Every structure is written in C-alpha cells, then in structure tokens.
Amino acid sequence: VRVAGLQDQVRVGFQKPENKAGLTPKQQLEKIAQKTHALVKRQSSVYQELVYEQLKQQDVQVLMMDELSKTQKIFTQHFFEEHVFPVLTPVAVDAYRPFPTLLSKTMNIIVILEQQSEDEINEKVAIVQVPSVLTRMIKVPSKKGDTFVYLEDLIIDQINTLFYGYKVKTATAFRMTRNADLTIHEEGARDLLVEIERELKKRKWGAASRLEVRANE
C-alpha cells in the first residue's frame, strides 16, 4: 500500500520532499526498488542453498521440463491434454483488443508469436492465464520420493498446441500485484459498510504496483 501511494503521487506530479526522510516520492521509490531487488536476490539464494537442498534430502524435487525422463514427459503431456488444455483461454492483444485487465497476483504467460505471410513476418502478442482451478505444483511419477513441475512450466512446454498456424517466439510467465489501498470517505458515505465493500471489490483492479517476471531458463 505504501509503494502504491508513492506511485500515485509520482503519477500526478507531486514532488514535495517527505518531512522525515527528506526524499521526494520518486526518490523514495528508487530507494525501495534497490532494497526490494536485494531482498528478492537474497530470497532466491536462500531457496537454492537451503530450502531446495533440504527438499532434496527428503527426496522431494521440483524439476524443469527438460529434466524429466521420457516416462515423465509422456505423463505430463497426457495431463496437459486431459486437465489443462480444456481450461485455457488465450487472449490476443492487438490494436482492436487491448491488453486484458488481469487480476492481482494471478500467474499469467505472455506469448510472442510470429506468422509468416507472403512478404513478411507478422509479430503478435497473446496472454494465457494460468488457471487457478488447478494446483500450481503438478506431481509426476517418480521411482523415488516425490517429483513436481510447475503448472506454468507445463503450459509453456505445450504452448505450441494453443496457437495453430503460428510460431512461438517466446513465452514468459509473469505476475502482477495491484494497488490494494483503500480510499474511504467516511464523511460523505451514507452507509460506511457499503462503501467499504465497494472499495474492497475495487482492490482487485487497482493500478499495477509490482511486476514479477519469471527468468527463462
């Protein structure tokens, strides 16, 4: 909420330094970004060096799609065809269809497509929402312990099946966090409860305050 409020101030051109820190909203955002990037880097290191290794010791592993055995690949393909493909709805983005409004903190995949015409290659963009009706961790058969793959990795692995006639140039998973700030005018609200309910519904569609992009392995 704090970051979203600062972003709102920058958006409207507010440049007055904040009394305690002596920094403008833009300068505060820059400081926050530096700190956040360092924290995310540390989080990744802790996962790789501690959590991931401890999971391996308990015979639990999360694999990339290219690390699966032939038998596991066959399983994931069948799982995709039976359970995932039926609930996927790709959305094209172009001059006539603007970028869709995505729910806060939902996992999505942005796909860059190429279509060959007689004289040129046309590039298009599509969005595929990772279905929330399915668990993100997909368990696959394993001779020892428990093995999982991420649902978004499985979708990306099979992404070509969604775009017949196109060549998939890139497919990248991302997640966006929206402004969850509540703006309630108590004095002008006839029914405070109704006003709160209205603002809570709007939180899902607030301005974007954070974008997380999955690194392509």
Regions found by a protein language model. Give the residues of each.
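N-terminal non-catalytic structural scaffold regions of very large proteins
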Residues: 1-217
